[in-house]
Each structure stands twice: as structure tokens, then as C-alpha cells.
Amino acid sequence: MELEDIRRDYSLGGLRRADLPQEPVELFELWLKQAVEAKLTDPTAMTVATVDENGQPFQRIVLLKHFDKTGFVFYTNLGSRKAQQLEQHSKISLHFPWHPLERQVHITGTAEKLTALENMKYFTSRPKESQIAAWASKQSSRLTARAALEGKYLELKQKFAKGEIPVPKFWGGFRIKIDSIEFWQGGDHRLHDRFLYSKDQNDWQIDRLAP
């Protein structure tokens, strides 16, 4: 397979300094809204990157579940590889690849655990099947066969057939406190537009970066 000639032009539009609000979350909200309106597949899907104790990076796709000026939120099994890595190294990066809109957003920050109340509010809002799945899977542990996982799910489905399902102690969320957020818009002749918001005490410094 020849990869050298796989490329395309970027022509959907540019991004100017005058277009940028002082708060980066406002621009992110606009771009996410436009991604949803464009009917992109999984517009809230983001790549979450963490590192282990040896500095080895790991990435996976996770769904964004909430965001505001205080940070970006996702949920996971607290025994998962990403959660265990965040216990040791709280630095994290997020990446939203909205290719059809010729846009990317890259976020760096620090992860902190959500409160038990925040976890409960989201967990109880999930479909019952998703709640049971959270109990059934010991995320990132080794499995002998898929049948073992499916059997555990069916066992728990019967156990929790009636009444509310409690929040597992090994399940919860993280809020990513933003250190920086970069907005990338594809441009003509590979002259892409990149703007970096960097946290400067209680304000944001905005810089244009070379593509």
C-alpha cells in the first residue's frame, strides 16, 4: 500500500483571531454544537492519553459526558488502566478529531476524581443495561473468553432485576482541569489555523501557532 499520495485539500474555511472568545469553553461549545448538527458519528468521542510509571503513553477513545469552565468530565472503571495511571500521574491530554469539519481540538490538563454525589447522579441516569455492564466488567483485566463476561452480565441482570442498581465502588468519573486548549482549523495550501489558549492565573493567553 502506497501512503505518500494519500492527502486531501482543506477548504471549509479559516479561523481568525477576531473570531475567538476570551473563554475557550465558549468556542468549544460552538464547535461541538456544529459537530452535532453536522451529524458527525460520535461527536463527543475523544482520545484520552495517559502515561504509566515508565512514561509509556497509552490512548483510548472515551465519550465526553459534561463540560463547563471547571473542566471536562468522563467516567470509567476505577480499576482500569487509565484510572490507575491517573492515580500515579494526573497529567492527561484529550483530543477531539472532527475530520469532516476539518477541525481538531487538543486539551491538556490535570485529572481529579469526581465526588460520590456526582458519580451517583450520572450513574442513575444511565440505561439499566449500561449500569449492569459497569458491574460485570473488570476493565483491563484478562479474560479467558467472551462467554465468561456474558455469563457474568446475565448473572447480574437477574440479581438486579428488581429495584435500583447501586453505584459500584470501583466506578466513577474524572474532571479534567484545563491547562491549555488548542483549536485547529484546516486551511488552504496546508496553511492551517491554530490557536492556543494557555492558562495564565485567572485569565487565558491566546497565541496563534504556525501550522
Swiss-Prot record:
Its cofactor is FMN. FMN binds at residues 60-65, 75-76, 81-82, 104, 139-140, 184, 194. Its EC number is 1.4.3.5. Pathway: Cofactor metabolism; pyridoxal 5'-phosphate salvage; pyridoxal 5'-phosphate from pyridoxamine 5'-phosphate: step 1/1; Cofactor metabolism; pyridoxal 5'-phosphate salvage; pyridoxal 5'-phosphate from pyridoxine 5'-phosphate: step 1/1. PROSITE patterns: PYRIDOX_OXIDASE. Binds 1 FMN per subunit. It comes from the Bacteria. PANTHER family: PYRIDOXINE-5'-PHOSPHATE OXIDASE, PYRIDOXINE-5-PHOSPHATE OXIDASE. HAMAP family: PdxH. Homodimer. This is Pyridoxine/pyridoxamine 5'-phosphate oxidase. It comes from Aliivibrio fischeri (strain ATCC 700601 / ES114). The gene is pdxH.
